[in-house]
Amino acid sequence: MSIESEMIHVEVVYALPQEQRVLTLVVNQQATVEEIIRQSGVLEIYPEIDLGKNKVGVFSRLVKLDATVRDKDRIEIYRPLLADPKEIRRKRAEQAKESGAADPVTGGKPSPLRKAD
């Protein structure tokens, strides 16, 4: 097998609210996700990335740092959530009930068919 056939093309992606950085690399097909991320230089560009805390994935599927990838895969580094999505939805529903924008019984949109009490 030639050296060329052992190499694959991959992308390392890190997204911030104001920008998305896509780094394209040619790496050995046996390289792990962690090795590829380190080789990409993204950790130097964004020192806030901590591979011990930030989750990583390939095409939106979580993977471990010791996983290998295939040709043309996209390795994504995920930022931690700032708030719990369930908690945000609960608060939004409470506010809608209080303001009258939600049915006080069901919590959904008020039904025009329901009789007012």
Curated annotation (Swiss-Prot):
Source organism, top-level taxon: Bacteria
Q: Where is this region: Disordered?
A: 90-117
Q: Tell me the Gene3D superfamilies matching this sequence.
A: RnfH-like (3.10.20.280)
Per the record, the similarity remark reads: Belongs to the UPF0125 (RnfH) family.
Which NCBIfam families does UniProt cross-reference here? PRK01777.1
Descriptive protein name: UPF0125 protein VV0820
* UniProt organism field: Vibrio vulnificus (strain YJ016)
Species lineage = Bacteria, Pseudomonadati, Pseudomonadota, Gammaproteobacteria, Vibrionales
